[in-house]
């Protein structure tokens, strides 16, 4: 049995295949996922698992150098936005690097998901609970 934090074989596999600047999406239950993009569906029911639970597990295993977030989260989900910024600040300290935070429109965000290696769908049912993680290197 794998000893690391990620037991889901699909998530573990996609993270292990990421190269520098490749992207991986963690999203809420409502984000449309392009047919051409690998879908890893973790959603069990509304809110389970939460966006932050999935993001926490993924970022424990993935080196992150930048993130892309929809601008709309600031107005429509400010509590999650603050939680997300706190998580990214802690992740920077843990990884020992600066994580660039880029904002874009939700429409542009949805278009960018098509370029990702995979989209991991959580059970989150709050607005704009989505992030594109850009892979960094550990050296």
UniProtKB/Swiss-Prot annotation:
Cellular component GO terms, alphabetical: cytosol
Keyword RNA-binding assigned: no
Gene Ontology biological process terms from the UniProt entry: D-ribose catabolic process
InterPro entries listed in its UniProt record: D-ribose_pyranase (IPR023064), RbsD-like_sf (IPR023750), RbsD_FucU (IPR007721)
TM region positions: none
SUPFAM superfamilies: RbsD-like (SSF102546)
EC numbers for this chain: 5.4.99.62
Residues where substrate binds: 28, 106, 128-130
Family: Belongs to the RbsD / FucU family. RbsD subfamily.
Subunit structure: Homodecamer.
Name of the protein in question: D-ribose pyranase
Protein source organism: Escherichia coli O6:H1 (strain CFT073 / ATCC 700928 / UPEC)
């Amino acid at each position: 049995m794998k000893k690391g934090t990620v037991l889901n074989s699909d998530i573990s596999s996609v993270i292990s295949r990421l190269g520098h600047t490749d992207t991986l999406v963690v999203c809420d239950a409502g984000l449309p996922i392009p047919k051409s993009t690998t879908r890893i569906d973790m959603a069990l029911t509304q809110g389970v698992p939460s966006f932050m639970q999935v993001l926490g597990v993924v970022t424990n295993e993935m080196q992150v150098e930048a993130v892309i977030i929809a601008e709309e989260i600031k107005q429509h989900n400010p509590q999650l936005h603050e939680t997300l910024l706190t998580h990214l600040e802690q992740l920077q300290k843990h990884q020992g690097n600066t994580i660039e935070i880029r904002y874009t429109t939700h429409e542009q965000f949805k278009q960018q998901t098509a370029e990702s290696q995979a989209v991991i769908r959580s059970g989150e049912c709050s607005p704009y609970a989505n992030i594109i993680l850009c892979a960094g290197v550990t050296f």
